[in-house]
């Protein structure tokens, strides 16, 4: 799912969280990174197949409505997949460690920094999604811009060859960069925002419960489940 340099960065961050923050937070961080990466991979593959099917539908039917329908169905795969993977990882983190414990305390394997394990697991899960979004934006943006500029320069040198001519090899690289930046980058950004919103609501619910325990755990669970 990740290139080699991404894997080393993610694994080192995972180890740091487990050693110095909270012993199980590294696992939740890795779950978040895997969920975000899986959503990006499915989004890119579905977009690639949808491009071919949309073009073929337009050639066969010559109907704008039928062509747009195929394009929207292909785009909905990544949109629904982002929400599905975000919820899957979030619910998985809650189920693996038996939900939310507002009054629990924990620490890392080496450091004695006390924290709430439930909150820290949710936070690091969101951070795992965010770090993949950053990698996709940076790598996809650089790749896209390099291919785009090189294709523009070649089109200016060769006046008989337009920028998007299939004979220009940089066009394929430009399309790949657009796929990574526009599909994987947007998918990971959306998933990161979606998960961060849920994590923030959980932290607010735990803070309210710790400030006023009289509201009961039923209200806490309802507040956590609502988002």
Residue positions per predicted region:
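Single conserved hydrophobic/aromatic residue that forms the stacking wall/gate
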Residues: 1-10
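Membrane-interface segments at loop-to-transmembrane junctions
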Residues: 4, 56-79, 161-190
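Structural signal for membrane-spanning alpha-helices in multi-pass inner-membrane proteins
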Residues: 17-21, 40, 90-94
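Helix-coil boundary and interhelical linker segments in multi-pass alpha-helical membrane proteins
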Residues: 19-27, 95-120, 203-225
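Juxtamembrane helix-loop transition segments at the membrane interface in multi-pass membrane proteins
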Residues: 41-65, 97-107, 136-170
């Amino acid at each position: 799912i990740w290139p080699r340099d991404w894997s080393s960065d993610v694994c080192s961050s995972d180890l740091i969280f487990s050693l110095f923050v909270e012993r199980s937070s590294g696992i939740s961080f890795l779950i978040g990174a895997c969920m975000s990466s899986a959503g990006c991979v499915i989004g890119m593959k579905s977009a690639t197949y949808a491009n071919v099917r949309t073009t073929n539908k337009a050639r066969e039917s010559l109907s704008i409505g039928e062509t747009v329908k195929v394009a929207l169905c292909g785009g909905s795969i990544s949109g629904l997949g982002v929400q599905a993977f975000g919820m899957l990882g979030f619910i998985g983190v809650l189920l693996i460690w038996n939900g939310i414990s507002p009054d629990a305390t924990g620490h890392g394997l080496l450091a004695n920094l006390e924290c709430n394990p439930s909150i820290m697991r949710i936070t690091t899960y969101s951070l795992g999604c965010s770090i993949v979004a950053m990698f996709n934006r940076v790598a996809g943006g650089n790749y896209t811009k390099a291919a785009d500029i090189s294709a523009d320069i070649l089109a200016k040198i060769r006046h008989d060859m337009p920028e998007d001519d299939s004979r220009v090899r940089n066009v394929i690289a430009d399309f790949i960069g657009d796929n990574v930046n526009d599909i994987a980058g947007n998918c990971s950004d959306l998933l990161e925002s979606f998960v961060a919103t849920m994590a923030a609501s959980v932290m607010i619910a735990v803070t309210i419960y710790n400030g006023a325990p009289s509201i009961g755990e039923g209200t806490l669970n309802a507040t956590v489940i609502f988002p």
